[in-house]
Amino acid sequence: MSESSVPKTPSGDDSEADLYKSGIYLFMDVVNPDNCKDVIEFILKQNTEKKRKKKLQLMICSPGGDMPSCFALIDVMKGSKIPIHTVGLGLIASCGLLLFIAGEHGYRVLTPNTSILSHQFSWGNWGKEHELFAQVKEFELSTKRMLDHYKKCTGLDEEQIREHLLPPEDVWLSAKEAKKLGI
C-alpha cells in the first residue's frame, strides 16, 4: 500500500482514520495494481457497511499509470451502490483523468490549480511476430474502452473526443477548459 493513501483498516484517531471514517479516500500516487486494490477494498468495505454513507469522495492527484488497474477501479466505482464524488487536485493526468471522470456526473470538482492532461495511451511490447499481432487486439480493445469511457462521462462523441481530448499530441487543460468539455 502506498504511504500516501488512506489505510485499509484505520487505527487510532489520526487524520487518515478520520478521512476513512468520513468516506474520503486520498489517492496521491501513480495508478498501479497495488494502490488501485487499496481503493477498491475501500469502496467495497464502504458498500458492505450496515449503515452506508450517502456518498464517498475520492480525491485524486495522479500522473496516471496502468490502464488495466485503472479500468478495474473504474468498474468498481461505477458498480458502487454509494455514489462516488471525485475531486481533482494538483494533477490529474492520463489514467488519473480517467479515474476522475468516473465520479458521479455533477459531483466532480476540479480545484483551480489542477493541471489536467489527456492523451492517447502509450504501450510497449516485445515478442515474436504472432505475439505482437495478438497484442494489437488488446491495444484496439483498450482504445475502445477509453473512448467509450470518455463518451459516457463527458457526453462528447468520438469525433469530439479525438479532436479535443485524444489528438496525436498531449492536451493540457485548465479547470475551466475541462469543464467546457464535460470533464
Regions found by a protein language model. Name each.
Residues 1-183:
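Terminal-region recognition feature
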